[in-house]
Amino acid sequence: MIEAIRIGIGGPVGSGKTRLVETLVPRLSAAGLSVAVITNDLVTDEDAQRVRRSGVIDPERVLAVETGACPHTAIREDPSANLAAAERLNRRFGDLDVILIESGGDNLAATFTSDLVDYWIFVIDTAAGDDIPRKKGIGLLQADLLVVNKIDLAALVGADLDMMRRDCAIARPVKPTVFTDLKSGHGLIELTERLIDGAMLGVGVP
């Protein structure tokens, strides 16, 4: 059995991780990839239920992991529950190409272990403050792809997008950053291109 590529999606609470999952699934599917999703929450399956209700994926292809601890534990120190969920999906769907693993909302230090994922994305948003890239949390520094989401809110919260772009370039000189408004779809084409290329998914961008 060839295992699917596992892609992690992490970031603070409310940054847009679940929206990113809901946005990526149809684009990856349109590129001819067979996709499944694992969500992580502390004591509920709220995010999994949301993804199932979204209509972008067969509900059977969505599994929930209830971590019962700090979210980063299940994606870094002890990923066994997520690995078990990934194995279940691989066995259930023999054609599976990609599994998106969404972490529970965490802080700027959240990272994925390479035992769990092949590639990972870190999501922040402008409403949390334009100084976030300058603070250089380890998640922001180490992620394969950084997504700065909710650029539509920047003017409303006084966030300086030009400064954020400069600070991201300083913090991540050789790693890509994409600025998005996932609600409207702004930046989605570039994000998908970066993901498909970076994770070596071997398909064209739809």
From Swiss-Prot:
GO terms for cellular component: cytoplasm. GO terms for biological process: urea catabolic process. GTP binds at residues 11-18. Keywords: Chaperone, Cytoplasm, GTP-binding, Nickel insertion, Nucleotide-binding. It is found in: Cytoplasm. GO terms for molecular function: GTP binding; GTPase activity; nickel cation binding. Pfam families: cobW (PF02492). The keyword Nucleotide-binding applies. It comes from the Bacteria. Transmembrane segments: none annotated. Homodimer. UreD, UreF and UreG form a complex that acts as a GTP-hydrolysis-dependent molecular chaperone, activating the urease apoprotein by helping to assemble the nickel containing metallocenter of UreC. The UreE protein probably delivers the nickel. Belongs to the SIMIBI class G3E GTPase family. UreG subfamily. Facilitates the functional incorporation of the urease nickel metallocenter. This process requires GTP hydrolysis, probably effectuated by UreG. This is Urease accessory protein UreG. The lineage of its organism: Bacteria, Bacillati, Actinomycetota, Actinomycetes, Mycobacteriales. The gene is ureG.
